[in-house]
């Protein structure tokens, strides 16, 4: 302990060597008296400059530290023990920065402060923080010359380990290493962090190039991203504008189409109204002209009622047809080309009516025989009075009805009736054979009339009710009377159709009812016989009622629910079979008894549940 140098002696040696000046060093030491926190950091590189506190004038420092008293030998930090410096040995100077730095580390690593520090010596040392000698020296607050020498020695260590900085540093005691660089050595000093103003770190041209390239790339990326985003936004806006324009155009087209359709519908409605007005005018004119054609005589009352009834029917039919057409137009909404087709059809149908008006002399021809028939009642004595009255009344009614109903005919009927009109000569011929009673037998086959004389009158009176078929019916009746063998076919077909329709379903119903009833009874008897035979056989035998294979499958399924590795012996399976049969037979017997007590012959689920409850209490 006596050989250990005191701090005052060490400082004297430093002053002698020229590493400390009296006025400026005092200021520096006062600044260093303030407590500072040491941060663990990596060693500084050769690029960092030495620390110079503000307000100090740098004196050229020799890289040699003279120790006034050194003990016999100095040991390395890796070796065991510590070499101590004493004041007995003389001062020695070393040449070269590398040797000086090594000597400073060697000497500073051997310093140990075991004495209690005084007030004056607080500014020259600090307590040791770590156990390694290099960290002891680095953690102590020492003058600038010692720190410079330590930095010089650390430069050699960094160069040997190829530690290269990647980014500019804000402090000289922090470094950033590349990802692929090796880890720093274990024996690295932890330098104190200085809070004073520092000079900027010098960057190598390589680092400057890299940083500039990175900045340019980042700028290019950001600009390209901004440009691309701007372009995308512009494209999206253009697409949206185009879509909006297309939608507007489509809406305009739809509106135009709707307007066109509405106009067409209005035109069609106007045309229909005009046609209806024309029809009404024609009907009124014909009604006015009817008494003039009949020789100024008023028409009978039944004919007027038939006229008005037919007029109402025709108007209702026309209105229904127009409503159907309008519904079809509204529901389907065809294209304008399809809608324009019915217009020419209407134009074609209008001239047909004018032709009918031009051919108006036809009804007077039918009415012309009225005075002739009125003059010849005595000449035709063979015909009975009923026949004459019916024949005289029928042409008048038919002529009046035909004259009154011609305007109310539908468009299709006008086309059909025009070719079927017969000249007046055929009409007169068809009336003459009615007077002969020998040709009347075909009418006797129709069961509707009791007397043969009433048949022609009924035919002639009933036909005018149908608007357009009156003329062809009269022609058919005339031909049928002239040719008797052809008439039975028409009359027989109508009568046979009316007779056969109700008879056919009755026969079929009888067949369907008879077929299922006959085989049911023998089947029931057979089933009963089979069941009875099976019961007798089972009573006399000792075999099991439950088959073995289905029961074994069911047992295996139940076993698999608990565990897959379970197995069963045949004896156990036989025992299960016997117990299940015994349980089922007991259940059926007892439930049968319960059903018989209830007055039933069939077993129900209620009986089984009752047996289970009773078994639970009994056993």
From Swiss-Prot:
The gene is H3v1. Residues 28-50, 66-99, 296-306, 314-325, 345-360, 385-408, 415-521 have a biased composition (Low complexity). GO terms for molecular function: DNA binding; protein heterodimerization activity; structural constituent of chromatin. SMART domains: H3. Transmembrane segments: none annotated. Residues 1-99, 190-526 are annotated as: Disordered. This is Histone H3.v1. InterPro entries: Histone-fold (IPR009072), Histone_H2A/H2B/H3 (IPR007125), Histone_H3/CENP-A (IPR000164). Residues 1-15 have a biased composition (Basic and acidic residues). Residues 230-287 have a biased composition (Acidic residues). PANTHER family: HISTONE H3-LIKE CENTROMERIC PROTEIN A, HISTONE H3.2. It comes from Dictyostelium discoideum. GO terms for cellular component: centrosome; nucleosome; nucleus. Residues 326-344 have a biased composition (Basic residues). It comes from the Eukaryota. Belongs to the histone H3 family.
């Amino acid at each position: 302990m006596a050989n250990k140098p005191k701090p005052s002696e060490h400082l004297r040696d430093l002053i002698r060597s020229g590493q400390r000046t009296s006025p400026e060093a005092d200021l520096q030491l006062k600044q260093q008296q303030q407590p500072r926190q040491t941060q663990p950091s990596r060693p500084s590189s050769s690029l960092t400059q030495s620390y110079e506190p503000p307000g100090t004038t740098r004196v050229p420092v020799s890289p040699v530290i003279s120790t006034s008293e050194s003990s016999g030998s100095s040991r390395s930090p890796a070796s065991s023990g510590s070499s101590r410096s004493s004041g007995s040995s003389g001062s020695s100077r070393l040449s070269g920065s590398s040797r000086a730095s090594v000597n400073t580390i060697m000497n500073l690593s051997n310093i140990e402060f075991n004495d209690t520090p005084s007030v004056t010596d607080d500014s020259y040392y600090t307590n040791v923080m770590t156990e390694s000698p290099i960290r002891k020296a680095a953690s102590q607050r020492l003058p600038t010359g010692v720190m410079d020498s330590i930095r010089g020695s650390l430069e050699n260590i960094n160069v040997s380990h190829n530690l290269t900085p990647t980014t500019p540093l804000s402090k000289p005691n922090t470094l950033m290493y590349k990802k692929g660089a090796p880890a720093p050595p274990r024996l690295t000093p932890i330098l104190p962090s200085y809070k004073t103003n520092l000079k900027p770190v010098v960057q190598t041209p390589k680092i400057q190039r890299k940083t500039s390239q990175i900045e340019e790339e980042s700028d290019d990326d950001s600009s390209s991203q901004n440009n691309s985003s701007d372009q995308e936004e512009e494209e999206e806006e253009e697409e949206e504008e185009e879509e909006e324009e297309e939608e507007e155009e489509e809406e305009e087209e739809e509106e135009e189409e709707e307007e066109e359709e509405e106009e067409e519908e209005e035109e069609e409605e106007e045309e229909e109204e005009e046609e209806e007005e024309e029809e009404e005018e024609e009907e009124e004119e014909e009604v006015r002209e009817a008494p003039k054609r009949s020789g100024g005589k008023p028409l009978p009352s039944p004919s007027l009622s038939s006229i008005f009834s037919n007029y109402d029917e025709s108007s209702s039919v026309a209105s229904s047809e127009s409503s159907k057409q309008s519904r079809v137009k509204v529901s389907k909404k065809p294209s304008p080309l399809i809608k324009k087709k019915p217009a020419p059809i209407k134009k074609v149908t209008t001239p047909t009516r004018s032709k009918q008006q031009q051919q108006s002399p036809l009804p007077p021809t039918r009415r012309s025989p009225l005075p002739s028939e009125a003059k010849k009642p005595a000449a035709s004595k063979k015909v009975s009075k009923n026949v004459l009255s019916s024949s005289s009344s029928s042409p008048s009614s038919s002529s009046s009805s035909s004259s009154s109903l011609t305007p109310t005919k539908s468009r299709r009927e006008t086309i059909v009736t025009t070719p079927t009109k017969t000249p007046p000569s055929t009409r007169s011929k068809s009336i003459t054979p009615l007077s002969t009673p020998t040709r009347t037998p075909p009418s006797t086959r129709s069961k509707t009339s009791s007397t043969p004389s009433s048949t022609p009158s009924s035919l002639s009176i009933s036909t005018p009710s149908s608007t357009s078929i009156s003329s062809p019916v009269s022609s058919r009746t005339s031909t049928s009377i002239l040719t008797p063998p052809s008439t039975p076919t028409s009359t027989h077909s109508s009568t046979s159709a009316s007779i056969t329709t109700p008879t056919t379903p009755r026969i079929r119903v009888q067949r369907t009812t008879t077929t299922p009833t006959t085989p049911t009874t023998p089947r029931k008897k057979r089933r009963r016989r089979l069941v009875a035979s099976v019961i007798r056989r089972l009573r006399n035998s000792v075999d099991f009622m439950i088959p073995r294979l289905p029961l074994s499958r069911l047992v295996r399924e139940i076993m698999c629910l608990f565990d897959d590795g379970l197995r069963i012996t045949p004896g156990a399976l036989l025992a299960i079979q016997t117990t299940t049969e015994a349980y089922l037979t007991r259940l059926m017997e007892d439930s049968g008894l319960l059903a018989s007590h209830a007055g039933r012959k069939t077993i129900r689920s209620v009986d089984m549940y009752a047996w289970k409850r009773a078994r639970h209490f009994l056993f």
